[in-house]
Swiss-Prot record:
Gene3D superfamilies: Nucleic acid-binding proteins. Residues 55-61 bind DNA. GO terms for molecular function: single-stranded DNA binding. Keywords: DNA damage, DNA recombination, DNA repair, DNA replication, DNA-binding. The gene is ssb. GO terms for biological process: DNA recombination; DNA repair; DNA replication. It comes from the Bacteria. This is Single-stranded DNA-binding protein. Residues 110-174 are annotated as: Disordered. Homotetramer.
Amino acid sequence: MASRGVNKVILIGNLGQDPEIRYMPSGGAVANLTLATSESWRDKQTGEMKEKTEWHRVVIFGKLAEIAGEYLRKGSQVYIEGQLQTRKWQDQSGQDRYSTEVVVNIGGTMQMLGGRGGQDNAPSQGQGGWGQPQQPQASQQFSGGAPSRPAQQPAAAPAPSNEPPMDFDDDIPF
């Protein structure tokens, strides 16, 4: 069996700016995001904390792009699952340039993290319901083209009955 390889990127980070939304001639939406991922560690020699931030270009297509444009803002925390692609383009002087991006297409995922509360730039009540009290919900997940699975609900506890507990103290050996 020949292996075809795997091209899958998973990122959790914060948006560096509001998404840039454009529409293709076919009418499909395209969202461009800049996503920051950070890692921190303690320097073994000096003992001081160090931090490194990587910036990722993310391109989202279709309905997910429209959702990103509507709900994501600078600073939003988001989970992205897509594929790495490098495209070639020419700058104004005709020089070949390359850009590597995480592409979220059919089968990709964008999940908003970090909850809804406390955001200064969130719409007020009546504009999408973001300010209205709701059941606790930490994230919203959207999959590009893939059928989304309903969130699993915790199993309900059995209703208490009025019967006394069963006494299994019998002498049956099996």
